[in-house]
């Protein structure tokens, strides 16, 4: 799999309209782990990641680096990647935050972030611009992105 990071087009965020979604994040958890991957909605995205209604340029709302897994339940490569994403959430607990976005339920959010291929992982460093990778990437590539993009060891 090619190791390709694509800068996120923030201009897409500027054309978003209001979207009403539930404010309660759902969690997805591996049964053997107490670390939870939070199911991200558009409203929670604006609170925890980027509030495009207030900010016209990228302004990360969080304190810790973030990985967002854009997926669909029917997507085979997404199902392959999911356990690895959960494993990274556990391994880097307290160092990064890991979210998941079901693109079928959160179409506006996926569209606003320019998501066209599944799975897509969005890496958001605490400072700097987000980057993404597409496809079911191997563990080594994911760990390299965490180290190089999120600057977490």
Provide a role label for each language-model segment.
Residues 1-43, 153:
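N-terminal targeting signals for export/organelle localization
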Residues 38, 97-99, 130-133:
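Structural signal for short hydrophobic segments within the conserved structured cores
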Residues 40-64:
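A short beta-strand-turn-helix
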Residues 63-66, 70-74, 117:
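Short pre-active-site segment immediately N-terminal to redox-active cysteine/selenocysteine motifs
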Residues 63-66, 94-96, 126:
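Loop/turn elements at helix/coil->beta-strand transitions in domains of secreted/extracellular proteins
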Residues 70, 81-89, 93-108, 115:
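Thiol-based oxidoreductase modules, predominantly thioredoxin-like and allied folds used
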Residues 73-80, 120:
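C-type cytochrome heme c attachment motif
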Residues 117, 122-153:
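Non-catalytic, surface beta->alpha helical segment in thiol-disulfide oxidoreductase systems
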């Amino acid at each position: 799999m090619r190791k390709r990071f694509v800068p996120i087009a923030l201009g897409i965020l500027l054309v978003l309209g209001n979207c009403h979604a539930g404010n309660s994040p759902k969690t997805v958890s591996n049964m053997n782990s107490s670390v939870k991957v939070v199911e991200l909605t558009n409203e929670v995205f604006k609170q925890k990641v980027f509030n495009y209604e207030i900010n016209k340029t990228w302004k990360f709302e969080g304190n810790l680096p973030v990985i967002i897994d854009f997926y669909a339940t029917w997507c085979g490569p997404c199902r392959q990647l999911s356990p690895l994403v959960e494993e990274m959430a556990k391994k880097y607990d307290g160092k990064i935050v890991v979210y998941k976005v079901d693109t079928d339920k959160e179409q506006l959010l996926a569209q606003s972030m320019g998501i066209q291929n599944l799975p897509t992982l969005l890496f958001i460093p605490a400072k700097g611009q987000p980057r993404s990778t597409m496809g079911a990437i191997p563990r080594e590539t994911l760990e390299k992105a965490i180290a190089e993009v999120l600057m977490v060891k």
